[in-house]
Protein backbone atom coordinates (compact mmCIF):
# COMPACT_ATOMS: atom_id res chain seq x y z
CA UNK A 1 0.00 0.00 0.00
CA UNK A 2 1.23 3.44 -0.87
CA UNK A 3 2.61 5.48 1.99
CA UNK A 4 2.95 9.20 1.23
CA UNK A 5 4.76 11.19 3.87
CA UNK A 6 4.11 14.89 4.46
CA UNK A 7 6.60 17.01 6.41
CA UNK A 8 6.30 20.56 7.88
CA UNK A 9 8.43 23.63 7.15
CA UNK A 10 7.73 23.51 3.33
CA UNK A 11 5.46 21.20 1.37
CA UNK A 12 7.63 18.61 -0.35
CA UNK A 13 7.24 15.19 -1.91
CA UNK A 14 9.59 12.48 -0.59
CA UNK A 15 10.13 9.53 -2.89
CA UNK A 16 11.38 6.01 -2.14
CA UNK A 17 13.94 4.80 -4.68
CA UNK A 18 12.36 1.36 -5.04
CA UNK A 19 9.13 2.62 -6.64
CA UNK A 20 8.29 4.74 -9.72
CA UNK A 21 8.65 8.47 -9.08
CA UNK A 22 5.48 10.36 -8.15
CA UNK A 23 4.59 12.72 -10.96
CA UNK A 24 5.10 16.43 -10.33
CA UNK A 25 4.64 17.38 -13.99
CA UNK A 26 2.93 20.71 -14.41
CA UNK A 27 3.71 21.93 -10.89
CA UNK A 28 6.23 24.66 -10.28
CA UNK A 29 8.92 23.55 -7.87
CA UNK A 30 10.33 26.16 -5.48
CA UNK A 31 14.03 26.86 -5.67
CA UNK A 32 16.02 24.49 -3.48
CA UNK A 33 18.52 25.98 -1.04
CA UNK A 34 22.22 25.56 -1.68
CA UNK A 35 23.39 22.24 -0.30
CA UNK A 36 25.61 22.45 2.78
CA UNK A 37 26.93 19.68 5.04
CA UNK A 38 24.19 18.32 7.26
CA UNK A 39 24.84 18.46 11.03
CA UNK A 40 23.61 14.88 11.36
CA UNK A 41 24.61 13.12 8.10
CA UNK A 42 22.80 9.93 7.13
CA UNK A 43 23.56 7.41 4.34
CA UNK A 44 21.97 8.57 1.06
CA UNK A 45 19.54 5.64 1.10
CA UNK A 46 18.63 5.91 4.80
CA UNK A 47 15.48 7.96 4.10
CA UNK A 48 13.66 9.14 0.95
CA UNK A 49 14.58 12.55 -0.54
CA UNK A 50 12.07 15.40 -0.78
CA UNK A 51 10.32 17.67 -3.31
CA UNK A 52 8.47 20.86 -2.33
CA UNK A 53 4.85 21.88 -2.98
CA UNK A 54 3.13 25.20 -2.35
CA UNK A 55 1.53 24.78 1.09
CA UNK A 56 3.09 26.50 4.09
CA UNK A 57 1.36 25.62 7.36
CA UNK A 58 2.03 24.18 10.83
CA UNK A 59 0.38 21.25 12.62
CA UNK A 60 -2.08 20.33 9.86
CA UNK A 61 -4.73 17.67 9.71
CA UNK A 62 -5.69 16.65 6.17
CA UNK A 63 -8.89 15.03 4.90
CA UNK A 64 -10.14 14.31 1.36
CA UNK A 65 -13.81 15.01 0.58
CA UNK A 66 -15.44 14.75 -2.87
CA UNK A 67 -12.29 15.57 -4.81
CA UNK A 68 -11.13 18.37 -2.51
CA UNK A 69 -8.38 18.23 0.10
CA UNK A 70 -8.90 20.18 3.32
CA UNK A 71 -6.09 21.08 5.70
CA UNK A 72 -6.70 22.29 9.26
CA UNK A 73 -3.78 23.90 11.03
CA UNK A 74 -2.63 26.02 13.93
CA UNK A 75 -3.43 29.70 13.45
CA UNK A 76 -6.10 32.19 14.39
CA UNK A 77 -9.30 30.20 15.07
CA UNK A 78 -7.80 27.12 13.30
CA UNK A 79 -6.97 27.84 9.67
CA UNK A 80 -8.56 25.95 6.77
CA UNK A 81 -6.85 25.52 3.38
CA UNK A 82 -8.34 23.73 0.36
CA UNK A 83 -6.81 22.23 -2.79
CA UNK A 84 -7.82 19.95 -5.69
CA UNK A 85 -4.79 17.73 -5.00
CA UNK A 86 -1.99 17.35 -2.48
CA UNK A 87 0.24 19.14 -4.99
CA UNK A 88 -2.03 22.17 -4.76
CA UNK A 89 -2.66 24.86 -5.53
CA UNK A 90 -3.62 25.34 -1.87
CA UNK A 91 -5.83 28.28 -0.94
CA UNK A 92 -6.64 29.59 2.51
CA UNK A 93 -10.44 29.69 2.67
CA UNK A 94 -11.24 30.58 6.28
CA UNK A 95 -11.26 29.14 9.78
CA UNK A 96 -13.06 26.55 11.89
CA UNK A 97 -14.00 28.81 14.79
CA UNK A 98 -15.75 32.14 14.29
CA UNK A 99 -14.37 33.41 17.62
CA UNK A 100 -11.85 32.44 20.29
CA UNK A 101 -12.26 28.99 21.82
CA UNK A 102 -14.88 28.92 24.56
CA UNK A 103 -12.44 27.07 26.84
CA UNK A 104 -11.15 29.61 29.40
CA UNK A 105 -7.45 28.72 29.40
CA UNK A 106 -4.36 28.76 27.20
CA UNK A 107 -4.10 30.31 23.75
CA UNK A 108 -7.80 30.62 22.90
CA UNK A 109 -7.18 32.70 19.76
CA UNK A 110 -4.99 30.15 18.01
CA UNK A 111 -5.71 26.59 19.20
CA UNK A 112 -2.98 24.01 18.67
CA UNK A 113 -2.60 20.81 16.67
CA UNK A 114 -6.15 20.31 15.34
CA UNK A 115 -7.33 16.97 14.01
CA UNK A 116 -10.46 16.63 11.89
CA UNK A 117 -12.39 13.38 11.38
CA UNK A 118 -15.63 12.52 9.60
CA UNK A 119 -18.13 10.27 11.37
CA UNK A 120 -21.89 9.74 10.97
CA UNK A 121 -22.33 12.65 8.52
CA UNK A 122 -20.59 15.04 10.91
CA UNK A 123 -17.13 16.61 10.83
CA UNK A 124 -15.35 16.82 14.19
CA UNK A 125 -12.38 19.14 14.70
CA UNK A 126 -10.50 18.34 17.91
CA UNK A 127 -8.06 20.98 19.14
CA UNK A 128 -5.93 21.95 22.16
CA UNK A 129 -5.45 25.14 24.15
CA UNK A 130 -2.39 25.58 26.35
CA UNK A 131 0.69 27.67 27.06
CA UNK A 132 4.09 26.47 25.90
CA UNK A 133 6.00 24.45 28.47
CA UNK A 134 3.10 24.00 30.90
CA UNK A 135 0.49 21.30 31.31
CA UNK A 136 -2.42 23.56 32.28
CA UNK A 137 -4.06 22.45 29.04
CA UNK A 138 -7.36 21.34 27.55
CA UNK A 139 -8.73 19.54 24.51
CA UNK A 140 -11.90 20.83 22.89
CA UNK A 141 -14.03 19.91 19.89
CA UNK A 142 -16.08 21.69 17.24
CA UNK A 143 -18.54 20.08 14.79
CA UNK A 144 -20.03 20.89 11.40
CA UNK A 145 -22.06 19.22 8.67
CA UNK A 146 -19.53 20.37 6.06
CA UNK A 147 -15.70 20.40 6.05
CA UNK A 148 -15.19 24.00 4.92
CA UNK A 149 -15.37 27.27 6.86
CA UNK A 150 -18.69 28.41 8.32
CA UNK A 151 -21.26 26.36 10.18
CA UNK A 152 -18.97 25.07 12.92
CA UNK A 153 -20.22 24.79 16.52
CA UNK A 154 -17.63 24.99 19.29
CA UNK A 155 -18.67 22.49 21.98
CA UNK A 156 -15.72 23.43 24.14
CA UNK A 157 -14.13 21.19 26.74
CA UNK A 158 -13.62 17.46 26.25
CA UNK A 159 -10.80 16.80 28.77
CA UNK A 160 -8.28 18.95 30.63
CA UNK A 161 -5.19 18.75 32.83
CA UNK A 162 -3.58 21.08 35.34
CA UNK A 163 -6.60 23.03 36.57
CA UNK A 164 -10.36 22.90 36.13
CA UNK A 165 -13.11 20.29 36.27
CA UNK A 166 -11.84 16.74 35.85
CA UNK A 167 -8.15 17.67 36.04
CA UNK A 168 -7.93 15.96 39.44
CA UNK A 169 -8.80 12.57 37.92
CA UNK A 170 -6.36 9.96 36.58
CA UNK A 171 -4.62 10.29 34.11
CA UNK A 172 -5.08 14.07 33.94
CA UNK A 173 -3.25 14.57 37.25
CA UNK A 174 0.07 13.74 35.54
CA UNK A 175 -0.53 14.14 31.79
CA UNK A 176 -0.60 17.11 29.42
CA UNK A 177 -3.85 17.26 27.45
CA UNK A 178 -2.64 18.52 24.07
CA UNK A 179 -2.01 16.95 20.63
CA UNK A 180 -5.41 15.24 20.31
CA UNK A 181 -5.85 12.35 17.88
CA UNK A 182 -9.23 10.65 17.50
CA UNK A 183 -9.68 7.27 15.83
CA UNK A 184 -13.10 5.76 15.07
CA UNK A 185 -13.12 2.06 14.23
CA UNK A 186 -15.47 0.22 11.89
CA UNK A 187 -17.48 -0.78 14.96
CA UNK A 188 -18.16 2.90 15.66
CA UNK A 189 -16.09 3.03 18.85
CA UNK A 190 -14.02 6.19 19.20
CA UNK A 191 -10.74 6.68 21.04
CA UNK A 192 -8.96 9.89 22.04
CA UNK A 193 -5.17 9.61 22.13
CA UNK A 194 -3.26 12.57 23.54
CA UNK A 195 -0.24 13.73 25.51
CA UNK A 196 3.03 15.64 25.42
CA UNK A 197 6.08 15.23 27.70
CA UNK A 198 5.25 14.58 31.41
CA UNK A 199 3.72 11.08 31.67
CA UNK A 200 3.70 10.46 27.92
CA UNK A 201 0.86 9.51 25.61
CA UNK A 202 -2.50 8.28 26.89
CA UNK A 203 -5.77 7.03 25.44
CA UNK A 204 -9.35 7.17 26.69
CA UNK A 205 -12.52 5.88 24.96
CA UNK A 206 -15.17 8.32 23.75
CA UNK A 207 -18.94 7.90 23.82
CA UNK A 208 -21.03 7.56 20.64
CA UNK A 209 -21.32 11.32 20.22
CA UNK A 210 -17.49 11.75 20.31
CA UNK A 211 -18.19 14.77 22.53
CA UNK A 212 -17.57 13.09 25.90
CA UNK A 213 -15.34 10.46 27.46
CA UNK A 214 -17.04 7.08 27.87
CA UNK A 215 -17.06 5.41 31.28
CA UNK A 216 -14.68 6.10 34.14
CA UNK A 217 -11.42 7.66 32.98
CA UNK A 218 -9.47 6.27 35.94
CA UNK A 219 -10.16 2.68 34.92
CA UNK A 220 -10.42 3.13 31.14
CA UNK A 221 -7.26 5.21 30.55
CA UNK A 222 -4.31 3.45 28.89
CA UNK A 223 -0.73 4.72 28.91
CA UNK A 224 0.51 3.91 25.40
CA UNK A 225 3.91 5.65 25.11
CA UNK A 226 6.34 6.39 27.93
CA UNK A 227 9.95 5.98 29.02
CA UNK A 228 10.91 5.36 32.63
CA UNK A 229 14.25 7.16 32.45
CA UNK A 230 13.95 10.80 31.40
CA UNK A 231 16.60 11.75 28.80
CA UNK A 232 16.41 15.49 29.59
CA UNK A 233 17.06 17.33 32.88
CA UNK A 234 14.28 18.50 35.16
CA UNK A 235 12.87 21.99 34.71
CA UNK A 236 13.40 24.62 37.42
CA UNK A 237 10.26 26.59 36.59
CA UNK A 238 8.62 28.00 39.74
CA UNK A 239 5.14 26.93 38.62
CA UNK A 240 4.65 23.21 39.43
CA UNK A 241 2.46 22.87 36.32
CA UNK A 242 5.41 23.99 34.19
CA UNK A 243 8.11 21.65 35.46
CA UNK A 244 8.80 17.93 35.43
CA UNK A 245 10.61 17.04 38.68
CA UNK A 246 11.93 13.70 37.41
CA UNK A 247 13.15 15.10 34.08
CA UNK A 248 11.64 15.74 30.66
CA UNK A 249 10.45 13.01 28.30
CA UNK A 250 10.16 14.48 24.76
CA UNK A 251 7.23 12.34 23.55
CA UNK A 252 4.23 13.92 21.80
CA UNK A 253 2.17 14.27 18.61
CA UNK A 254 0.54 10.82 18.55
CA UNK A 255 -1.66 9.56 15.72
CA UNK A 256 -3.53 6.24 15.53
CA UNK A 257 -4.21 4.61 12.15
CA UNK A 258 -5.24 1.19 10.83
CA UNK A 259 -3.59 -0.80 8.03
CA UNK A 260 -4.97 -4.34 7.99
CA UNK A 261 -4.33 -6.29 10.13
CA UNK A 262 -2.46 -3.84 12.39
CA UNK A 263 -3.19 -0.64 14.28
CA UNK A 264 -0.25 1.77 14.08
CA UNK A 265 0.55 4.37 16.73
CA UNK A 266 2.80 7.11 15.36
CA UNK A 267 4.47 9.70 17.59
CA UNK A 268 7.18 12.37 17.57
CA UNK A 269 10.25 12.12 19.76
CA UNK A 270 12.82 14.81 20.55
CA UNK A 271 13.22 18.58 20.38
CA UNK A 272 10.77 20.15 17.94
CA UNK A 273 11.80 23.78 17.65
CA UNK A 274 13.60 26.87 19.01
CA UNK A 275 16.88 25.60 17.56
CA UNK A 276 20.15 27.49 17.85
CA UNK A 277 22.00 26.78 14.59
CA UNK A 278 25.32 27.23 16.40
CA UNK A 279 24.37 24.83 19.16
CA UNK A 280 22.10 22.12 17.78
CA UNK A 281 21.12 19.21 20.04
CA UNK A 282 23.19 16.01 19.85
CA UNK A 283 22.25 13.73 16.92
CA UNK A 284 19.02 11.89 17.67
CA UNK A 285 17.81 14.45 20.21
CA UNK A 286 15.93 16.50 17.59
CA UNK A 287 12.46 15.52 16.34
CA UNK A 288 12.02 12.17 14.60
CA UNK A 289 8.97 10.10 13.70
CA UNK A 290 8.51 6.78 15.48
CA UNK A 291 5.87 4.05 15.44
CA UNK A 292 4.61 0.88 17.07
CA UNK A 293 1.83 -1.52 16.15
CA UNK A 294 -0.83 -3.64 17.84
CA UNK A 295 -3.71 -5.95 16.98
CA UNK A 296 -5.95 -3.73 19.15
CA UNK A 297 -6.56 0.04 19.01
CA UNK A 298 -6.07 0.00 22.79
CA UNK A 299 -2.58 -1.49 22.62
CA UNK A 300 -0.13 -2.50 23.85
CA UNK A 301 1.91 -1.19 20.89
CA UNK A 302 5.35 -2.64 20.20
CA UNK A 303 8.17 -1.79 17.79
CA UNK A 304 9.95 -4.13 15.37
CA UNK A 305 12.15 -5.45 18.18
CA UNK A 306 9.09 -6.25 20.29
CA UNK A 307 9.67 -3.39 22.75
CA UNK A 308 6.53 -1.94 24.30
CA UNK A 309 6.14 1.76 23.47
CA UNK A 310 5.04 2.25 27.08
CA UNK A 311 8.50 1.05 28.12
CA UNK A 312 10.73 3.13 25.86
CA UNK A 313 10.09 1.40 22.52
CA UNK A 314 9.51 3.02 19.13
CA UNK A 315 10.60 2.23 15.56
CA UNK A 316 12.24 5.21 13.81
CA UNK A 317 10.41 5.86 10.53
CA UNK A 318 11.90 9.20 9.51
CA UNK A 319 14.68 11.38 10.91
CA UNK A 320 16.99 14.25 9.91
CA UNK A 321 18.67 13.75 6.53
CA UNK A 322 19.79 15.82 3.53
CA UNK A 323 18.02 19.21 3.86
CA UNK A 324 15.43 17.75 6.26
CA UNK A 325 15.87 18.57 9.94
CA UNK A 326 13.68 17.49 12.86
CA UNK A 327 10.68 15.90 11.07
CA UNK A 328 7.57 15.28 13.20
CA UNK A 329 3.98 16.31 13.89
CA UNK A 330 2.61 13.48 11.76
CA UNK A 331 -0.83 12.24 10.73
CA UNK A 332 -2.19 9.65 8.29
CA UNK A 333 -4.62 10.17 5.40
CA UNK A 334 -6.12 6.98 3.96
CA UNK A 335 -6.78 7.06 0.20
CA UNK A 336 -8.02 4.38 -2.20
CA UNK A 337 -4.49 4.18 -3.58
CA UNK A 338 -2.88 3.90 -0.16
CA UNK A 339 -1.99 5.69 3.06
CA UNK A 340 -0.47 9.16 3.31
CA UNK A 341 1.70 9.94 6.32
CA UNK A 342 2.16 13.72 6.60
CA UNK A 343 4.47 15.61 8.94
CA UNK A 344 6.53 18.78 9.35
CA UNK A 345 10.24 19.50 9.32
CA UNK A 346 12.74 22.35 9.33
CA UNK A 347 14.69 22.83 6.13
CA UNK A 348 18.45 22.77 6.66
CA UNK A 349 20.48 24.98 6.63
CA UNK A 350 17.69 27.54 7.20
CA UNK A 351 16.65 26.16 10.60
CA UNK A 352 14.20 28.55 12.21
CA UNK A 353 11.41 28.63 14.76
CA UNK A 354 8.33 26.75 13.53
CA UNK A 355 5.36 28.97 14.26
CA UNK A 356 2.68 29.25 11.59
CA UNK A 357 4.47 28.87 8.26
CA UNK A 358 5.98 25.45 7.55
CA UNK A 359 6.43 23.16 4.56
CA UNK A 360 4.27 20.14 3.73
CA UNK A 361 6.14 17.12 2.31
CA UNK A 362 5.11 13.70 1.04
CA UNK A 363 6.98 10.50 0.22
CA UNK A 364 5.85 7.33 -1.49
CA UNK A 365 6.31 3.64 -0.73
CA UNK A 366 4.48 0.51 -1.88
CA UNK A 367 4.23 -0.94 1.62
CA UNK A 368 4.95 -0.44 5.29
CA UNK A 369 8.46 -1.58 4.44
CA UNK A 370 10.02 0.06 7.50
CA UNK A 371 8.76 -3.05 9.34
CA UNK A 372 10.50 -5.52 7.03
Swiss-Prot record:
Question: Which PANTHER family does this one have?
Answer: ARABINAN ENDO-1,5-ALPHA-L-ARABINOSIDASE, ARABINAN ENDO-1,5-ALPHA-L-ARABINOSIDASE B
Which residues does UniProt call coiled coil?
none
- Protein name stated in the entry: Probable arabinan endo-1,5-alpha-L-arabinosidase B
Q: Which organism is it from?
A: Aspergillus fumigatus (strain ATCC MYA-4609 / CBS 101355 / FGSC A1100 / Af293)
In this chain, composition skew of type Low complexity spans 23-34
What does the record give as EC number? 3.2.1.99
**Annotated signal sequence range:** 1-16
Molecular function in Gene Ontology: arabinan endo-1,5-alpha-L-arabinosidase activity
Q: One of this protein's GO BP terms?
A: xylan catabolic process
Q: Which reaction does it catalyse?
A: Endohydrolysis of (1->5)-alpha-arabinofuranosidic linkages in (1->5)-arabinans
Q: Region Disordered: start and end of each range? A: 23-52
Q: Which CDD domains match?
A: GH43_AnAbnA-like
**Which domain of life does the UniProt lineage start with?**
Eukaryota
Main localization (coarse) = secreted
Q: Which residues form the active site?
A: 59, 252
Q: What positions are marked as the site Important for catalytic activity, responsible for pKa modulation of the active site Glu and correct orientation of both the proton donor and substrate? A: 179
The reply on keyword Secreted is yes
* Pathway listed: Glycan metabolism; L-arabinan degradation
First-tier enzyme category under EC? hydrolase
Q: Specify whether Glycoprotein is a keyword of the entry.
A: yes
* Entry similarity comment: Belongs to the glycosyl hydrolase 43 family.
| Residue positions with a glycan | 120, 363
Q: Which InterPro entries does the entry mention?
A: GH43_arabinanases (IPR050727), Glyco_hydro_43 (IPR006710), Glyco_hydro_43_endo_a_Ara-ase (IPR016840), Glyco_hydro_beta-prop_sf (IPR023296)
- Name any GO cellular component annotation: extracellular region
Q: What does this protein do?
A: Endo-1,5-alpha-L-arabinanase involved in degradation of pectin. Its preferred substrate is linear 1,5-alpha-L-arabinan.
Amino acid sequence: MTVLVALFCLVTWTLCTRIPQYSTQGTQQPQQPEKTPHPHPQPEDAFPPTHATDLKIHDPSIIHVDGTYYSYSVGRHIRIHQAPSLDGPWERTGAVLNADSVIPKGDRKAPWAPQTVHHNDTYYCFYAVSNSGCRDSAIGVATSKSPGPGGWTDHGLLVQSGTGKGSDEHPFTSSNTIDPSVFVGEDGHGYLTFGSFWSGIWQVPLDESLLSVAGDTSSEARQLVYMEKAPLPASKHPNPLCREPSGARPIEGSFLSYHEPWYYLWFSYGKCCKFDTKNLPPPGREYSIRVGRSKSPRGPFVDKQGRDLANGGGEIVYASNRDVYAPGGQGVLTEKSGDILYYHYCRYPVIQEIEVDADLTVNKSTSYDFWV
